A protein has these predicted regions:
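Catalytic cores of nucleotide-sugar-dependent glycosyltransferases that transfer UDP/GDP/TDP-activated
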Residues: 1-186
Length: 186
């Protein structure tokens, strides 16, 4: 197994993961998500990997589906890739900043693309909505934590998988992802 690390001195080496000890989130968490999303996608391109399915887990990867379906949609590694996102209870508390919207813009990943998808970046769950709107499938990562986002996915006809029992997770995830990769109805 190959393992690659992407880091940034300002984002990684002098602080905790998402917040200070008191629990206050870092103001640039969403900008960090953009940095890592683009870093990973550029690495996939450079290594000439062509994934069939890209699995995004949690809010930190929420911008990845948006980038794959807009800015990277014509890149050979991503042109036919399917995107599956897992939703968990944690989402950043801070509202989207103007800086976030500016940082998010890249190639065809524009405010117009976000607006056309019906995503409002000022809403508290906007990162989750962004992931859902540009995903080919959505998995409930924590039972009952993102009911509104699952309902949103269903309203967009995005296939969803409710959180399976622990002893059924591996088989359920595999079947769901195989279904998405094969293009079958969920």
């Amino acid at each position: 197994m190959q393992v690659y690390f992407i880091d940034h001195d300002d984002y990684d080496h002098t602080r905790a993961l998402f917040s200070v000890e008191s629990g206050k989130e870092y103001d640039d968490n969403k900008e960090r998500a953009i940095f890592y999303a683009r870093g990973v996608l550029e690495t996939v391109k450079k290594l000439r990997w062509c994934p069939d399915v890209i699995y995004c887990q949690g809010w930190m990867s929420a911008v990845v589906p948006f980038y794959i379906k807009t800015a990277y949609r014509e890149e050979p590694p991503f042109a036919s890739a399917k995107v599956v996102s897992s939703l968990y209870g944690e989402m950043p508390d801070a509202t989207q900043t103007e800086r976030f919207a500016e940082c998010l813009e890249f190639r065809d990943a524009t405010p117009d693309a976000i607006k056309q998808a019906g995503v409002d970046l000022t809403l508290p769950d906007s990162l989750g909505r962004l992931a859902v709107a540009f995903s080919d499938g959505v998995i409930e990562g924590e039972a009952g934590k993102q009911d509104e986002l699952l309902a949103y996915a269903k309203s967009l006809n995005v296939p969803t998988l409710a959180m399976p029992a622990d002893d059924e997770k591996a088989a359920a995830y595999k079947a769901f992802i195989d279904q998405i990769a094969g293009g079958e109805e969920a």
